[in-house]
Amino acid sequence: MKINQLPAPVLTHGLVPLAHRLIQLHLFLTRTEVMNEIGITSRLDQGEKGIAVLWHQRLYGAISYAKNATKYQPSAIISRSHDGDLISALVHRFHFRPIRGSSSQGGKEALSAIVNDLKANPLAIHAADGPRGPRGVVKAGLIR
């Protein structure tokens, strides 16, 4: 059985909480070093805005920084797909604010929403390459 064939309650009330706990355990057992973290956080604390940009294949590594970013409650663009439903529920548990959209569904609205969100909040997160690739190539939209 594929994961997307499981009933929604099993996923949202079973798999997502389990994944959250496993990631918390992983974060507890590992050490993360962020280069120039004080420079970044001091600017955010002074009211400056920031967009953390990363590659799709590095998303899990970015979660390790989640515990340091929770006070900023960053917004993150997440696909409107079934997988995006799970990811959205998971990042919400880390105090990220999901904004749903992608290059194929609701991307324009998501980009507009994240720009508006940055007016009220200091930090947003976005994967610069689309989930369909090519990997490591910045897609149009984030930077105009």
Regions inferred by a protein language model and the residue ranges of each:
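Membrane-associated lipid acylation/remodeling enzymes share a hydrophobic transmembrane-juxtamembrane segment
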Residues: 122-144
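Short amphipathic alpha-helical segments and helix-helix/interface helices
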Residues: 40-41, 88, 142-143
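Short, well-structured alpha-helical segments in soluble
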Residues: 114-119
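Membrane-anchoring hydrophobic helices of lipid-metabolizing enzymes
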Residues: 1-65
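Structural motif
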Residues: 107-113
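Catalytic core of membrane glycerolipid acyltransferases/transacylases, capturing the structured
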Residues: 49-105
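Acidic, metal-coordinating catalytic cores used for nucleic-acid/nucleotide bond scission
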Residues: 82, 104-107, 131-138
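Short acidic/histidine-rich motifs immediately flanking catalytic phosphotransfer sites
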Residues: 48, 120-122
